[in-house]
Amino acid sequence: MKFVDEAIIRVEAGNGGSGCVSFRREKYVPDGGPDGGDGGDGGSVYLQADENLNTLITFQFERFHIAERGKNGRGRDCTGHGGEDLILKVPVGTRAIDNDTEESLGDLTTHGQKLLVAKGGFHGLGNTRFKSSTNRAPRQKTLGTDGEVRSLKLELLLLADVGLLGMPNAGKSTFIRSVSKAKPKVADYPFTTLVPNLGVVNPRPGQSFVIADIPGLIEGAADGAGLGVQFLKHLERCRVLLHILDVEPIDGSDPVESARAIVGELEKHSPKLAGKPRWLVINKADLMLEEELQERIDHIVKELEWDGDVYTISAYNREGTAELAVKLLDFIASLPPEEEVDADAEVEFKWDNYHQSANESVNEDFDDDFDDDFDEDDYDVEIIYQR
């Protein structure tokens, strides 16, 4: 299935049902009083994470999603049925953003997690709600409010512990093949990798981590060049980044300048991403003699002013890859646990406090001198004033 990691959709929560103006009419009960019921609340729209999904492609063809409207209230104190909530299934790792305000509504990082993205309209109140000692035949009601309408931008961010960075043909896909069961395409031309790939690494029995491979970066990627910049967001949730550096590029480019270009693109895209722990991994060590290799590594470390750990591997021959995987596992285990995001936290919705202000405004409209004893329908059949 085609990998799609972005989609823009429109969600509309259901409108609330309106209240009813009705009066009880029975034989020998001339003044039965009000019995108009409330309307039903409109259905809300939720996103729910589903581990069985891995792409947002379905939302490219279904862009409009509308929840059910609440039913209107009826006589005999019958409350309208609430609208059914609409639940949209999305892959685990999806982020919801308000496309108009760029406000982040939340992330769905665990299977079954739900996120409210459009709140249903509040129900209208029937005239029974407005009866009092001074207003015994109220003809007031409130209408149901409109449901929330949002234009949503859905972004799928892959959940991985380790992310791979590097120029095209640096050997990232070969590395992920050497340490996991993932089988991304490998060839001797740039941009062989067109979409992100995930692999599960098992350095020890019962212990594992997830590694993500994205298309290679080139200079100017933050400004739209190449493919990698649009996939950098998939590294935002990684705990550590592996900077794969080709010690002997096939095009004769300088590894130092390539490394600097990658760091520059990271800083342009996201300072937070650039500040993540980053390990330098020198790949294709089998292409040089040992003495030349060490001189090249010393030169690279000196020019980059690198003060962190440096690992030398040959992903093709799987030399040093198993040891690196074990060190990654130990490093990830030593990191403090990530802060848990409150799954119940909700953003502010426009109708949160509407019913309070609606009740206050209706009550202010009452006149104490209103003749509530008079009713032109006292000697007629039941009449329901219902919109």
Curated annotation (Swiss-Prot):
- Which top-rank group of organisms is this from? Bacteria
- Required co-factor? Mg(2+)
Cellular component (GO) terms are: cytoplasm
Q: Which Pfam families match?
A: GTP1_OBG, MMR_HSR1
Domain OBG-type G, residue spans? 160-333
Q: Name one GO biological process term.
A: ribosome biogenesis
Compartments it resides in = Cytoplasm
The GO terms describing molecular function are: GTP binding; GTPase activity; magnesium ion binding
Q: Which UniProt keywords apply?
A: Cytoplasm, GTP-binding, Hydrolase, Magnesium, Metal-binding, Nucleotide-binding
Q: Is Metal-binding set as a keyword in this record?
A: yes
Root EC class: hydrolase
Obg domain ranges (all copies)? 1-159
What positions does the entry give for Mg(2+) binding?
S173, T193
Annotated PROSITE patterns: G_OBG (PS51710), GTP1_OBG (PS00905), OBG (PS51883)
Residues binding GTP are 166-173, 191-195, 213-216, 283-286, 314-316
The protein's Enzyme Commission number: 3.6.5.-
Q: Which family would the database say this protein is a member of?
A: Belongs to the TRAFAC class OBG-HflX-like GTPase superfamily. OBG GTPase family.
What job does this protein perform?
An essential GTPase which binds GTP, GDP and possibly (p)ppGpp with moderate affinity, with high nucleotide exchange rates and a fairly low GTP hydrolysis rate. Plays a role in control of the cell cycle, stress response, ribosome biogenesis and in those bacteria that undergo differentiation, in morphogenesis control.
What NCBIfam families has UniProt attached to this entry? Obg_CgtA, PRK12297.1, PRK12299.1
List the protein's name: GTPase Obg
Task: Provide the species name.
Answer: Shewanella halifaxensis (strain HAW-EB4)
Species classification: Bacteria, Pseudomonadati, Pseudomonadota, Gammaproteobacteria, Alteromonadales
